[in-house]
Regions:
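N-terminal capping/lid subdomain adjacent to the active-site entrance of alpha/beta enzymes
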Residues: 1-154, 161-168, 172-175
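Conserved functional loop/turn residues at catalytic and ligand-binding sites
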Residues: 178
Length: 184
């Protein structure tokens, strides 16, 4: 399980989209967003609602008017990009004229015991770690993670789990531990 303030994820069901044209296949996927009540099932209903348009060869621009922003549109948009790249024999970055470059990946530590959170943080090899917190053992959890990863840039995300008073209490303590940002 992966826990944040007020919610625990026990599975991630995914909508997979496959589009085919001229023996080329474009693929896209999305998990949806729980706080918008998106699920694989609801995204599938949305995707199927424009099946006719997809079969007639809808493009990315038209897609923006056919579906609202969300997981279904994202999965189809990714499949359209992938298909266009394969049909043209170019990469996405060549199609967009954006040079590829290295990016910093952020791994997230979900809410768990001090020991598990520290062990998960220690196992990450990324320079930035996002730590999910609720309103319990906040300082202790961050101290354990900082001890496990003294080299990491740490960002805290409490998902609206703190009051303003809690923020005022923890902010100076977290600053002393080198926390880069608190996301509320």
């Amino acid at each position: 399980p992966f826990s944040i303030t007020g919610y625990t994820f026990t599975e991630a069901r995914v909508l997979y989209v496959t589009l085919t044209e001229n023996n080329c296949t474009g693929q896209g996927e999305a998990t949806g967003v729980y706080y918008l009540d998106e699920s694989a099932d609801s995204m599938l209903v949305q995707a199927n609602s424009i099946k006719k348009e997809l079969e007639q060869g809808v493009d990315r621009e038209a897609l923006q008017t056919l579906l609202p922003a969300g997981g279904a549109r994202n999965a189809i948009d990714c499949a359209l990009w992938d298909l266009e790249a394969k049909l043209s024999g170019q990469s996405i970055w060549e199609l967009t004229d954006i040079e590829p470059h290295d990016i910093t990946t952020v791994n997230t530590v979900g809410i768990d015991t001090l020991e598990k959170m520290a062990a998960i943080a220690a196992a990450f090899d990324t320079p930035v770690i996002k730590v999910k917190l609720d309103n319990r053992l906040c300082l202790e959890r961050i101290q354990a993670i900082r001890a496990a990863r003294p080299d990491a840039e740490i960002v805290v995300d409490v998902n609206q789990g703190w009051t303003f008073e809690q923020l005022k209490t923890f902010a100076p303590q977290f600053k002393a531990l080198g926390i880069a940002m608190i996301e509320q």
